[in-house]
Amino acid sequence: MTHSKTDRLYANPLAQVSQFVFDENVVDVFPDMIKRSVPGYATIINMIGNLAERYTQSGSQCYDLGCSLGAATLAMRHRIQAADCKIIGVDSSAAMLQRCAQIMAADTSDIPVDLVEARIQDVPITNASVAVLNFTLQFIPLDERQSVLNNICAGLRPNGVLILSEKLAFEDETHQQLMIDLHHNFKRANGYSDLEIAQKRTSIENYLIPETLAAHRHRLRTAGFHSVDVWFQCFNFASLIAIK
């Protein structure tokens, strides 16, 4: 049920490259796509489970915001030791959630998981000890990102955490180009052609909007988190932990 097809969505020349959407075609290849496109993704997922084990409080809720097929949800579900907890997975893609529900049903953990089809911007966060935005905020319009983080921080218990993973931009143009080149080399090493890389880049242009670490730190501090720092980075992909 979790078997993933090989990502060949952009393998052939397209007369017009449409904006990327998380539809059934992406669902079918998503695990392969993200493994071959995001350096360190497996490590990030594993460590989300580790962090959830450390920070989940008894009787609280954990949120996977932009859960896609539930990789972070499963990582938390398999590691949480605190009693009477629930995980809430949220995604705006019906196709993603349908497949995610099948994956959760096949999993043997007894921690309850609720799946909600909604925009992250519209989801109330309550009684939370852990929230995850794993490569999700980058798809939310820039002018809505602060309110999303404000909402999360307000809904976290004291000492609750947000794990925020994002593709990064860099202020220094030389470093920015270096990170792009290294990332593209990573994708080539994983079997993507230059055509696939170029067409995928066109599809997410003006949709996936990366920001600098400084911008993320400032926004998290503004939201009310007292401790913010990077715990993982590979090239232009990083994950931060923010503690309330």
Curated annotation (Swiss-Prot):
EC identifiers of the protein: 2.1.3.-
Binding residue positions for S-adenosyl-L-methionine: 41, 66-68, 134, 201
Catalysis: reaction(s): prephenate + S-adenosyl-L-methionine = carboxy-S-adenosyl-L-methionine + 3-phenylpyruvate + H2O
Complexes and interactors: Homodimer.
Signal peptide per UniProt: none
GO molecular function: carboxyl- or carbamoyltransferase activity; S-adenosyl-L-methionine binding
Xref: Pfam families: Methyltransf_25 (PF13649)
Protein's name in the database: Carboxy-S-adenosyl-L-methionine synthase
Organism: Cellvibrio japonicus (strain Ueda107) (Pseudomonas fluorescens subsp. cellulosa)
Encoding gene (name): cmoA
